[in-house]
Amino acid sequence: MKKERLMSINKEKAEAAIYQFLEAIGENPNREGLLDTPKRVAKMYAEMFLGLGKDPKEEFTAVFKEQHEDVVIVKGISFYSICEHHLVPFYGKAHIAYLPSDGRVTGLSKLARAVEVASKRPQLQERLTSQIADALVEALNPKGTLVMVEAEHMCMTMRGIKKPGSKTITTTARGLYKESRAERQEVISLMTKD
């Protein structure tokens, strides 16, 4: 699948655009250190945008009926994405909780795969958080879902305000975790506990 996506990128067009960008900033794209840069950057972005055209809910291919009705939490799922405003990285951790309905659970790796698909595209952290939650709701129809994403944005570290180390936290709650503040707080405390 990865190879398919890499092949679907218009490499020639991407390489030409990067070549022109280097010229636009006053660089010589024909100098030794930059000769292969357009090709390398196009290949890198093809990999970083593997999630384009994919739906994160399609990652939930394994759904099992178990006698489990209590919360399931997977925390600390590392990810990186590209800010769609500045095309620089943001990266961090996603924490996912869901309360199974009728014992429907999924493979734990499927949660990480959904994060991967949703993050590998030009993205906003707020949208990323919602897309992960919505994919889980559509795939499993749980009683409740809560997604928390903590990330550092290079657009705040490298430019503008220049505040390295600052983290942005976003949450999205669905079902019981949206309706009940007490239930939501309990799950958040489990997510943030070391």
From Swiss-Prot:
Matches recorded under InterPro entries: GTP-CH-I_C/QueF, GTP-CH-I_N, GTP_CycHdrlase_I, GTP_CycHdrlase_I_CS, GTP_CycHdrlase_I_dom
Give the enzyme class.
Answer: hydrolase
Q: Name one GO molecular function term.
A: zinc ion binding
Provide this UniProt record's keywords sorted from A to Z. Answer: GTP-binding, Hydrolase, Metal-binding, Nucleotide-binding, One-carbon metabolism, Zinc
Q: Where does Zn(2+) bind?
A: 83, 86, 155
Entry keyword Metal-binding: yes
Q: Which reaction does it catalyse?
A: GTP + H2O = 7,8-dihydroneopterin 3'-triphosphate + formate + H(+)
Question: What is one process in the GO biological process aspect for this record?
Answer: tetrahydrofolate biosynthetic process
| Cellular component per GO, a single term | cytoplasm
Q: What is its EC number?
A: 3.5.4.16
Domain of life, per UniProt, equals Bacteria
Assembly mode:
Homomer.
Q: Which family does it belong to?
A: Belongs to the GTP cyclohydrolase I family.
Under the heading HAMAP family, the entry gives:
FolE
Q: Which PANTHER family match?
A: GTP CYCLOHYDROLASE 1 (PTHR11109:SF7), GTP CYCLOHYDROLASE I (PTHR11109)
Instruction: Name it.
Output: GTP cyclohydrolase 1
Name of the gene: folE
